[in-house]
Amino acid sequence: MGKIKRADLDLIRCFAIIFVISVHGLSYVGFYELSNPSITLFVCHLIRVIVIICVPLFLILTGYLSAEKEYILSFKYLEKPFRLLAIYIVCALICSIPQFMRGEIKSFFVALFEFKAAPYAWYLAMYLGLYLMIPFLNEFIASKNGGGKSIFVLILLVTLPTVTNNCNFNSFEWWNGSKEQSSQLFPNYWDELYPIMYYMIGAFLKRNDAMANKLKKITLIIKH
């Protein structure tokens, strides 16, 4: 028996894709260069407020669809991230051809490890990080005794950026520089629990959806 297609989830995906296109489309119509108050600026701001939820929608969907699955950290589970990393490296090499021609090899490697060597690579970095954390998140969600080990791993993962992002590969005097000049070994959005929060919202919705279905079944049984 094949999987049942969920029209509501497909609809959310469609809206999320349209919102992504809309967010980036605003930069092409000159929205970010507008400064004087006008109807155009107001309308663009209103559109941006609505469509900026594009990434959160994808993260919530990920939590909804993945929270109740059992994942094991194995070579097979890690195959997908390695394939995506290979694609990223190829794209980064192509996008960095002008840098190579100027002899900027060092800046290329810095950008590569910061996921800035290709346009919008931050999104890939975020999803890869979330993908690697899903087994721990799901264990934490399913655990009935508090999931002590999972909590420790989560705390470790979200505090690592603060500890490791205080160096600057472009200067030997990194210790005396500002945080804005630091190189990011781990993206800052992990400090804010941004992806985890939306994943948990999706997991919460899935759990309540399952509970609602159980209540419906119980109600039908009682009626019969």
Which residues make up each language-model segment?
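Membrane-cytosol interface segments of multi-pass membrane proteins
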Residues: 1-163, 167
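Aromatic-enriched alpha-helical transmembrane segments of multi-pass intramembrane proteins
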Residues: 113-115, 139-224
